[in-house]
């Protein structure tokens, strides 16, 4: 019996103001857990897989049921402890403590290998939580679309005089994260050719409005890119195929995209990357019968994929790793110069992290889109001079279809997050929205992750692999009163390559919530400024000074 498979279940978060838990502070994690498994949100909900290879919301269906039952009976001064997707304890704490504490996929460093994780996973002792899958704050592809948009805009600013009209981006991967790329590209004014090996993923991105159309062949896809370059009308095109075959073929043909990147699930060479020349059926069968053969074939295929990206880079085309660890996989197989093209964080995003700016997100627990539109307006009211952000919110309302509970992603930083959280809480208190608002973020944030091949690649002081920072972030968020806090390993780049922390806090309209929101939404981004200031980044040191952060080691 497969305890992780149930084809009969359809999970959706409840909507409205009636709750089945004892308070909104426990109803919120309950709804967000269920929302992660909504068929409009999750990649494989019948297997509890939300996104990112095998990123799960719960370890198995029995654990899911026990989590739900535990949340429904949890008292206002109790905390539920969840170990890799299984509820293991309920303890008396206090009303300002987190209602849920989550640890996912954490392994003692010497044993933190994919092989050892897979053995524990098969034994039913662990699950892979990715970043927001096992921490119950995934909001569909919107969760990464603004970060991807900001990256593409910055590439355009640096390399194309700030104008991506008539330019096109080559990428691969249309899963839960990669599926944001086509919409982010067209929002930024560029066209995109996205290669994807699974038809269901192309269909989902077409259905949810993230992808404009599908090409029947590579020739048709290239013709559409050429036409868009002339008309300067941005279009996103999905192509069914294998990136390990398509990328090298484009190099052979002498095709020159304007930007090259990749968001296949290369971090998981067994479950996330189709080997060159294999069918989906063969891949699925061999994942169960001979996973080591799949891993070897996948990583061998990645060498050709990365070599093609290196070839584009050598042509002078802006080429960037988008954080899936594909360079490391290729280097492991002998491609010595795999890291010759940069990751997106050190190349384009780190200046934002130095100011504590990152992927702030919120969801309307009512299920009513109007609640999100009202919060959009509140963001504009409180940040009247941020025209770039206003433009983003306008585009998001027009072009992003909600998946599951209505939600919004909005990159803001220290000094603004707590103001927005307090304003949302006041809206709940005054009845301007129909139910509380849940506020969280990706683990990909300025102070909550250690990932030497992604968020902390090429740190100024060489502290790329120091993982004290996400641990301190999680501890501080617990002390500050976040509603649930998570500490994960392996998200984004795979087992052995990252540690990261998440937090979620509920704005339920009460004065107690206001006090928690003010603490959490100040301290959380402040840890990012602290981390980068400690590494010697002048922008972060200046931000700390302006905001009055007390950083003893940097006292002047």
From Swiss-Prot:
Q: What is its EC number?
A: 4.2.1.49
Reaction(s) catalysed by this chain, per the record, are: 4-imidazolone-5-propanoate = trans-urocanate + H2O
> What cofactors does the UniProt entry give for this protein?
NAD(+)
What protein does this entry describe? Urocanate hydratase
Chain's gene name? hutU
Instruction: State the source organism's domain of life.
Output: Bacteria
Taxonomic lineage per UniProt? Answer: Bacteria, Pseudomonadati, Pseudomonadota, Alphaproteobacteria, Hyphomicrobiales
Per the UniProt record, the source organism is Bradyrhizobium sp. (strain BTAi1 / ATCC BAA-1182)
Coiled-coil regions listed in the entry: none
Q: Please name the pathway.
A: Amino-acid degradation; L-histidine degradation into L-glutamate; N-formimidoyl-L-glutamate from L-histidine: step 2/3
Q: Which GO terms describe its molecular function?
A: urocanate hydratase activity
Which SUPFAM superfamilies does UniProt cross-reference here? Urocanase (SSF111326)
- Any note on cofactor binding? Binds 1 NAD(+) per subunit.
Pfam families in the record, alphabetically? Urocanase, Urocanase_C, Urocanase_N
